[in-house]
Amino acid sequence: MATDPRMASFDAVMFGVEGDPLLRSVITVIALLDQEPDRAVVRERAERMTRMYPKLRQRAVGNPISIAPPRWETDPNFDFDYHIRWRRLPQAMSSMAGVLDYAERMNEQDFDRSRPLWECAVLTDLDDGRAAVLMKIHHSITDGMGGMAMSAVLFDLTRVPADLGPMPSAPIARPANMLGRIRQGIEYEARQVLGELSTATDYAVSAVKTAVSDPLGSTLAAAEFTASAVKMLAPQGAPLSPLMTGRSLSVKFTIVEVPLPDLKAAARATTSSLNVAFMAAVVGGLREYHRQAGCELESIRVNMPISVRTEDDDAGGNRWVPARFVIPTDADDAAERIRDLLPVLREAQQDPALSMSDIVYRLLTVLPRPVTTALAGSLMKGVDVAATNVPGPPVEVYMAGAKVTMLVPFAPKAGAAVNIGLMSYAGRVFLGINCDPAAVDDPDALTDCVRAAMAEVVALGKPPKPRKATRRPAKHR
């Protein structure tokens, strides 16, 4: 009997804690097209994608009487038409606002756990003959960068779709019976115990060698490592924002767009990076939103993924670790905000605890699920804003004969009040703002504040306007 791969520890924790629905991890991406795509080509490319990346044909199956993570098992009832649906929108919903409204409702619905954890909707009859493709995928399947790698098979560089050659073979479904799942779970646990013992032995030998050669350095490193680990699992408490305290299952999607060269120029002018410039706009927007509401905001708690993905990693699964940290919001302008952010983000990216995140998540998988869910909730619901940055295609691409004019990510709130995702595409940057309406009373006002803060950041990269020469009055003799 073939054994499908198991969820990695981090993926298993994300999947398991959704016993609390506020912690759901669902990614939604909107691709706006200049015309309706060719239905046959969409089906052929999507079929090819599911064969190249088997997780798109696999369901997550638990293990009876076992603490082993869920197993990816090819769905014997895989129904392509269930996962990709075509919808003609009524005229009242044919604008971008209608697309966003449809995407919100799609995002709010949970997955059918007896099927693979992804869905797609192709919306047609939009204004000016346009169309939109909405992709919804569970975060346990892949992260943002992995998702872009998966979706590359959907895109072409010209309007005429390329011939990609023979269709790969479809994975064969070999579902295990109850006894088989019990046996596989026990075998997995036995292998894990042996692996952990080997890892512990190697670590102990290395620690002894280091302690002998550098006792002071090893003591300081151990203390720093322990402090970081404690901080990583310490409950976060209430959100730091006095305004954005509510949490719900609802979402509100909005979009901010900015030219990519302008944002890069601002990063160069401030000797920072695109990510720092992006975060400065996020912080500035939240600060102004609170100011307009007559509320003082001293700092915010941020959840930001730190990518550990390498070129050798496949597209499936997650290759990032979460960093949670507090950012002060008292800076009065964008330049000062960037200066304040540089050391904070540098420290977050170099936190020693990040290197032990896999060990921590392996520990969480063996705890009773209610305990893990409660611990995850204490970490995630105290976050004010989550922010993520994913590079998209650097040039214009086409999907089944239609040009992609906009590519916008909406990352999961997963307990936060807001998640702001950045995706670059063909010389532009799109911010997908995912607000919890229970936390953000006026999502449109927050979006305007983020847009204004982004304009302030972008202005840092533009040359100063030359002063107009003032003509002195002529002296009379």
Tell me what each language-model feature is.
Residues 1-11, 19-21, 26-477:
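Soluble acyl-CoA-dependent acyltransferase catalytic core bearing the H(X)4D motif
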